[in-house]
């Protein structure tokens, strides 16, 4: 039986502001635990930012998740058990 704290964690959005590409593993662990992540990559150096984004894209898609780019530095990483309803997409 889950506790209230576990239920709250599972229904929460985790906001992450990684400082370097070494934090990739933390994001994959959270996605694997079905935690929705809002990630601001602006603290990662420009040199490493694209590499970090590519690594996370591969990992999230490998776990059957989805990614919504909010801006060029902010991303929503969506585990497989979440649905994305995006009113901003054109029909």
Annotate each language-model stretch with its function:
Residues 15-16, 45:
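A generic structural signal for short
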Residues 22-90:
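Terminal membrane-proximal soluble interaction domains of membrane-associated proteins
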Residues 1-15:
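N-terminal leader/presequence segments that are low-structure
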Residues 16-22:
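A general structural motif
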